[in-house]
């Protein structure tokens, strides 16, 4: 069998092309099932790619990590058959065989690391020494699995390949250059690259962003972009164009080339011919595209961040956006809060999954008209990656430099036939994506500061703290907490300060309770809020005015209890009672923050 490491010292390595899009599966059947139901058909595909000139072929096992994660019976037999068919075909020409592993889902009960390792070890027992982890959107668990694999098979050659959109980001919002850098610095990955999603021309542009990764670079684009014709998905990229673009990459230093979706033996044959026509001496690695002179970053003066970083206690006030299309009263309320001394206005993103005026659009209007710092909430519930990026670019252009990234309340079950959740990622991955948009040559010259939520009322606060630490690792700068309405919430706030450190900016949540009915409702129907029973009883029999007075006093005392462990306060306006918030801000300014 071909020695991949030796070949790469002499010339580029040519892989095969797509399996699933070339081999026509039966309706409802996984392509991998054909390893058992149609072995001759799969063997014929392998042989066609080898006849086209491929130096290496992939086992027909892309979906195995997903099947293994689901504990689907028989995945081991699919692995065995997939390996045996590829090895049989490669044995006829001396080509290399790569055990092919697609993305594994990462869950608490079945971490991706364990899934990858189980599948890779199965292949290793069959004799595999070359492994391809492909079409990944993130590195979750893959490096840990490779480290463990190499303890068992130290001679293993491992190629890790990411699926990257033409804008340089994966579907999980990870920036390609950062992913490649992490693989190159791991010490356990032998080659790294890009595959799928993008067509040859776009992938060539992506490679120019990467420069010299320090490892052999792999490129396996799709034939083109998919179109639907007669209820079938087709790729229209021509073999000649595919070969021309990839041979250019080879002449620029890419060492491993092949095809993904829509590519056929004709594409690989054309690329084989083009590669054979190249001079024997080629660059060892691609050169980075020379960047244009960077424009000087003129960063706006952010009074909220400046005050927060200087150690002064800040006050953020949440005011829910209107349920209708009239913003007049809202803007007047925002003006009053600003005049009262609020440092920041926060705007929820359709709380409890009920549609309101868009939080980001409202934030832009407030910032533009009042010059006030704003913090729009951004959930993962309603937008995919494209919509999220488009919104972030618009926010940046409008001068908004802070967002609150949250996963978001799910759509009520009864409405899910008409309104769908999106949840392409969670708040941690959203934060990581937002931070990754800033930097030299990227979409934003300076970063957007990302805050997250911290639930002081979580039943298992240790788990909540672990998640908070992960949020910080993924780029968040601080947290807005759920309301402090119990002694346990204060104790958890203290624990958060001790655990997360002074670098994590924490704004303690203060929500005035205004009636016993209001308190009982929040205790029983609002996720993340716990109202102490003693507080609920205090409101019994009070009218509106008396209830508001008591709510004000309870809020001030809660703020005083939270103050030693907080960098400021996050005030939530009940029922749009701006006058109450004006009084609360005044009390906090005189009794707590100053």
List each language-model region with its residue ranges.
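Domain-level signal for soluble alpha/beta catalytic cores
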Residues: 1-594
């Amino acid at each position: 069998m071909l020695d991949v490491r030796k070949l790469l010292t002499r010339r580029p390595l040519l892989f095969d092309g797509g399996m699933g899009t070339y081999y026509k599966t039966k309706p409802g059947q996984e392509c991998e099932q054909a390893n058992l139901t149609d072995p001759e058909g799969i063997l014929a595909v392998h042989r066609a790619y080898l006849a086209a000139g491929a130096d290496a072929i992939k086992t027909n096992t892309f979906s195995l990590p997903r099947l293994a994660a689901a504990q689907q019976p028989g995945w081991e037999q699919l692995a065995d058959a997939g390996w045996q068919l590829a090895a049989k075909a490669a044995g006829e020409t001396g080509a290399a065989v790569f055990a092919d592993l697609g993305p594994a889902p990462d869950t608490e009960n079945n971490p991706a690391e364990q899934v990858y390792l189980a599948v890779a070890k199965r292949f290793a027992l069959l004799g595999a020494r070359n492994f391809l982890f492909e079409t990944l959107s993130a590195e979750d668990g893959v490096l840990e699995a490779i480290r463990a694999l190499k303890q068992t098979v130290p001679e293993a050659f491992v190629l890790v390949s990411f699926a990257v959109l033409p804008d340089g980001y994966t579907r999980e919002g990870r920036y390609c250059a950062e992913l490649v850098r992490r693989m190159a610095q791991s010490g356990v990955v032998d080659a790294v690259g890009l595959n799928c999603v993008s067509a040859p021309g776009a992938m060539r542009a992506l490679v120019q962003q990467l420069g010299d990764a320090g490892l052999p670079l792999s490129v396996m684009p799709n034939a083109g972009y998919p179109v639907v014709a007669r209820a079938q998905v087709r790729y229209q990229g021509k073999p000649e164009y595919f070969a021309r673009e990839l041979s250019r990459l080879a002449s620029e230093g890419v060492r491993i080339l092949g095809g993904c979706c829509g590519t056929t033996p004709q594409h690989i044959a054309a690329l084989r011919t083009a590669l054979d026509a190249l001079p024997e001496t080629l660059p060892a690695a691609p050169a980075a595209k020379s960047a244009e002179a960077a424009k000087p970053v003129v960063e706006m003066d952010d009074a909220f961040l400046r005050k927060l970083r200087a150690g002064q206690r800040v006050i953020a006030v949440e005011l829910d956006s209107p349920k209708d299309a009239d913003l007049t009263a809202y803007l007047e309320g925002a003006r009053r809060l600003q005049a009262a001394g609020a440092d920041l206005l926060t705007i929820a993103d359709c709380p409890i999954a009920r549609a309101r005026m868009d939080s980001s659009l409202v934030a832009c209007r407030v910032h533009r008209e009042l010059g006030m710092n704003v913090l729009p909430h951004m959930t993962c519930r309603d937008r995919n990656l494209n919509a999220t990026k488009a919104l972030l670019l618009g926010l940046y252009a409008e001068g908004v430099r802070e967002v609150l990234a949250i996963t978001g309340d799910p759509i009520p079950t009864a409405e899910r036939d008409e309104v769908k959740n999106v949840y392409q990622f969670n708040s941690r991955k959203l934060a990581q994506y937002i931070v990754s948009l800033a930097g030299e040559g990227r979409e934003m010259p300076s970063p957007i500061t990302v805050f997250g939520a911290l639930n002081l009322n979580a039943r298992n606060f240790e788990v909540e703290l672990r998640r908070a630490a992960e949020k910080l690792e993924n780029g968040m700068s601080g947290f807005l907490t759920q309301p402090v309405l119990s002694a346990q919430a204060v104790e958890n706030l203290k624990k958060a300060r001790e655990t997360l450190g002074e670098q994590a900016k924490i704004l303690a949540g203060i929500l005035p309770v205004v009636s016993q009915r209001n308190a009982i409702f929040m205790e029983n129907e609002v996720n993340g809020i716990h109202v102490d029973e003693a507080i609920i009883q205090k409101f019994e029999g009070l009218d509106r005015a008396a209830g508001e007075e008591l709510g004000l006093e309870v809020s001030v005392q809660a703020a005083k209890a939270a103050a030693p462990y907080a960098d400021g306060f996050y005030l939530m306006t009940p029922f749009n009672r701006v006058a109450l918030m004006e009084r609360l801000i005044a009390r906090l300014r005189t009794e707590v923050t100053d």
